[in-house]
Amino acid sequence: MNSESLENLHRPLIESSKSFVDYRLETVLTDRELPYFRRIYLAMMIEMKFLFHLAAPAIFVYVINNGMSILTRIFAGHVGSFELAAASLGNSGFNMFTYGLLLGMGSAVETLCGQAHGAHRYEMLGVYLQRSTVVLILTCLPMSFLFLFSNPILTALGEPEQVATLASVFVYGMIPVIFAYAVNFPIQKFLQSQSIVTPSAYISAATLVIHLILSWIAVYRLGYGLLALSLIHSFSWWIIVVAQIVYIKMSPRCRRTWEGFSWKAFEGLWDFFRLSAASAVMLCLESWYSQILVLLAGLLKNPELALDSLAICMSISAISFMVSVGFNAAASVRVSNELGAGNPRAAAFSTVVTTGVSFLLSVFEAIVVLSWRHVISYAFTDSPAVAEAVADLSPFLAITIVLNGIQPVLSGVAVGCGWQAFVAYVNIGCYYVVGIPVGFVLGFTYDMGAKGIWTGMIGGTLMQTIILVIVTLRTDWDKEVEKASSRLDQWEESREPLLKQ
């Protein structure tokens, strides 16, 4: 073992097309003949190869896809300040609502496909993909009515009439994108569970260029407004979806996991919906949390300034968050694959390494934000008042970025293990019982404004992060391996619920 370890590290990361699990990591971690620090060094070398093979393209994909939303808001801001506020409100109140819900439901595929792939049950991946897509599309049908009635909903919530009217126009053009999400997220998780992430990165990069060109033409050449920008956003997402479908059909890498359309996709839809709902609750409670901050800001004094400054801060936070979400995807894939393959120590080690790297990057990002706090808003608007407000909120933004370097990664570990139901309860308590009420009291009762709202919400995030750290440190990884095997057996036999508290 000692003489071969270094040589093994220079072999290809993935030696066999049968599995994306490297059994050398588990072997190194269990080799007691190696000195402790030598064992950790060799394990780090193996895991870092895996981590950046998965995380780097995933981060790129998430940043690029989120970049389309940010570009849409930037162009809206150059149309007018009310248009920026309306686009931000429409995006936060409706688009991100559906984005979080459907992405959360899609994470059911992440758990099942990841563990099935690690266990070499390749034929089930395509079935899980199709079932999830059917369930998500059916979910989109009633959700589209929320978009159609966005104007009266926003007015009933107390948003200013002019902003609510403009926001509803923006939201109408976003209706096609929710169906794109319903197809994209299962595909995304299907590919990620097989460590296929680079093709999606190329597709997203090409789409971003198309999105930028079309948005520029719409605003500066044709003089169109919010509706055109939101329709272009929807069109861009459908480009991504179609390109990924073509890749799955044509690529030899998906030959064993995609065997064509199957009637099995329509079997057990209710059970799969329940599984997806448990996954959705966990992620939605996280995704909607920051959006509630923007909605509450619309009720403050001078709501236009509050919305503009918070929208810019949330856009910056979203860019940083996408980096953490890339590590979230890597953690989920690594943990689910290793658990499915029966490698408990490798799963635990991957959790530690991924969380540590993500945290260090988030600290660097927070320092950059604080250094550029007086100029960073000018990428979105020319208003000096908004720039001053953004600079004033930058310390809160920096703290949020650091916390987001830890929490999403641990959520990815939870998805890989199938802990979605448990984390959902944690999120309810920390976010909605503690964070939002405290933020509301500080923001409105004590008249601290956006700072008060954000302070309470940071407290909720901190509490949730601490709980997830404690739970992860106390995890019995051998038992998690047993649960992963049992979960796959239960799903194939359709005997018991997949996710237990």
Swiss-Prot record:
The chain crosses the membrane at residues 44-64, 84-104, 134-154, 163-183, 200-220, 222-242, 280-300, 310-330, 352-372, 396-416, 422-442, 453-473. The keyword Transport applies. GO terms for biological process: xenobiotic detoxification by transmembrane export across the plasma membrane. It is a multi-pass membrane protein. InterPro entries: MATE_euk, MATE_fam. It is found in: Membrane. CDD domains: MATE_eukaryotic. Keywords: Membrane, Transmembrane, Transmembrane helix, Transport. GO terms for cellular component: membrane. GO terms for molecular function: antiporter activity; xenobiotic transmembrane transporter activity. PANTHER family: MULTIDRUG RESISTANCE PROTEIN. Belongs to the multi antimicrobial extrusion (MATE) (TC 2.A.66.1) family. This is Protein DETOXIFICATION 37. It comes from Arabidopsis thaliana (Mouse-ear cress).
